[in-house]
Amino acid sequence: MRLACAAVISPANAPMHVASFPSSSPSSVAATGTDDARLLHHRAVDDAHLRLAHAALDEIEARLRAPPATASAAGAAASGGGPKDPYLGEVHRDEGHVVYAHVGATAARFVLVMATEEEEDDDDASGAAGGTREETLRGMFRALSEAYADAVSDPFHAPGGKIASEAFARRVRALADAA
């Protein structure tokens, strides 16, 4: 799986930072190969990733508002940590992407949209390799949470506003490069 999009959503469900990492393969770009076509393609991909992250917010809200017993039963398989685990696991899936979520101590939502490989089947996603994937995702969320904490601790950051820090953007980009 490849990181396609990373988003930080405020407790009020406003996007604080959204970074999309479209595939750079030549087959994913319009056949004309012009810069305009490439730009339009990447903008459409960015919008698709944003829609996926937005669609996942309903499930995130449902899990956060669920009573502890229900949240534990519903999310135990995905998160493995019970109702107080900030890692929510898989919250949305479509034919080419899986969306994972984590909720920070400040109620900020961290969303990772992972592009699935066509040859990958569901057994690999939840089987023996699932533990490794789970650890990798938790590590990515930990790194994203640390970058977020550093960014919002900046005295020039407006509370609840968009994260404009270049250092934060670089750290998010490093997550995509490492995935």
Model-found features: residue ranges?
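Short, acidic, Ser/Thr-enriched surface-loop or helix-capping motifs
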Residues: 9-10
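Acidic, low-complexity cytosolic segments
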Residues: 2-4, 18-179
